[in-house]
Amino acid sequence: SRGLGDVYKRQVNQQRKLLRIAGGTKFIFTIHDFNFLTEKKPWKAKMYLRRMQNKVNKAAVVTTISHYVADVIRQHIDLKGKEIRVIYNGVERIDMLEGTQPSFATGRPFFFTIGQIRRKKNFHLLVDVMRHFPEYDLYICGDAHFAYAEEVRNLIREKQVTNVFLTDVITQSEKIWLYRNCEAFLFPSEREGFGLPVVEAMQFGKAVFAANRTSLPEVCNGHAIMWEHLDTESMV
């Protein structure tokens, strides 16, 4: 434990106030990302940043999930001389598990992507990309209750693209089937603290195409085709 003695470790939402901890208790604080800086209103982002600084001030150890996030921490947080320890996210082995074919699968060859349907994921870029691959379908899967999801649906309708399907949330077994049977995994996300889906896709030996942004070059580590420019001409 490198002289830390007994250390208290529990999952704490990085934006919430620090829970009351017994005096003298050492604890580890893990920072996952700084998405709030671009996703929240300025006053709220400042509040979250103050809360994060308060936790760092009191933490015995600060950890994070990628060297990319570690660099962002150094830009926005006074570490008080503390070291940041990078501990990559653990990834469950799912490639040996059974999958279930989703009811929406058409039987045609397909590409796959997954994640919350939020603007930072850049799923709208894939609509135009798929116009260049009429012989393939694309399944965009994930929590679609965000306003951006409706923008993607509208774009699909406006451009009359018939081979892109925004499916909403899927089960674990459906996800496994899609990873196992897709022709390639596409991940044009603009901001990731880690990027778990690209690692999951690699478990199945799939070709991964990902944005050369934030943590993704680090996590893909030369095992993916990286999109340098996020425009249709460059991505196809």
Question: Which sequence ranges carry the predicted segments?
Answer:
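Carbohydrate transferase catalytic cores enriched for Leloir-type hexosyltransferases
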Residues: 1-236
